[in-house]
Amino acid sequence: MNGKKIRGGLAPGSLLVMLVFGIWFGGLSSDVCAAPFDYAMYQQFLDRYVVAGKYIEGIKLNVVDYDAIHKDQEKRHSLYGNILQQLAVFDPDMLQNREEEIAFWINTYNVGAIKMIIDHYSVDSIRSRKINWLRNPWGIKILTIGNNAYSLGQIEHEILIAKYKDPLIHFAIVCASLSCPDLSPQAYEGSQLKEQLQRQARQFLQNTKKGLRIRKEDGVVFFSQIFRFDKESFPNGATDAILLIAPFVDDKEDREFLMHPAQYTIKYLDYNWDLNTLSSVQ
């Protein structure tokens, strides 16, 4: 808190009430909240705006209703606006353990990617020149967290990858595109993080249009380009991802084939940067 004197001799309980209402309704934009992060609003947001199991350009994915978010943000105390305010006053140092920290920063990255789209609406891709002329939005300071501004690149590379070094994180961060992993309809939480990340990995890798495609008949395995993009986690590309991927391949023959890279050629699936928007559902 900023230590300013409260006029009128308010009872101690009144300060707590003011803090709660400030967090939820935008009254303490310059102060940092010293409390565990509550994902209730974010879960409501996901329930309202994320639709699972749709198809765009032949790719199955979870889509986002950006049209509705953009329209609703103009309402007073919209879910979207309240979430941004909640992040702005939250101090990440209050998170209690590694799992809570990872869950928080994954959720925050995904909110930031959505905000990138809404801030420049309407666009057909996060790499639209309307966002950045060089088609590189990752350096834009897009979110305020605890009174500090962050870019998507900072959250992904300087925090999630550099600090936690868990490659399963790649299956949870969503860059608002068709070929990226699906936006989970459930908020990530520290107490469930391991199971949530494993579920995300399995779902992504079972999607042959964007995750993994094994063709034993002609000796080719197609990997997602996320294993080529991130040189920090996968310096040798897909070759470095094989041991990570194998446990999530349910078919025994496919899994055994994957584990012997000398018998196949590594190729990469096309990466579709089109927006994962409900308005494009076929």
Tell me what each language-model feature is:
Residues 1-9:
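N-terminal secretory signal peptides that target proteins for export/translocation
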Residues 13-27:
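Bacterial N-terminal signal peptides
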Residues 28-34:
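Sec/Tat signal peptide C-region and signal peptidase I cleavage site
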Residues 35-95, 100-104, 113-282:
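Interaction/scaffold regions that mediate signaling and macromolecular assembly across diverse proteins
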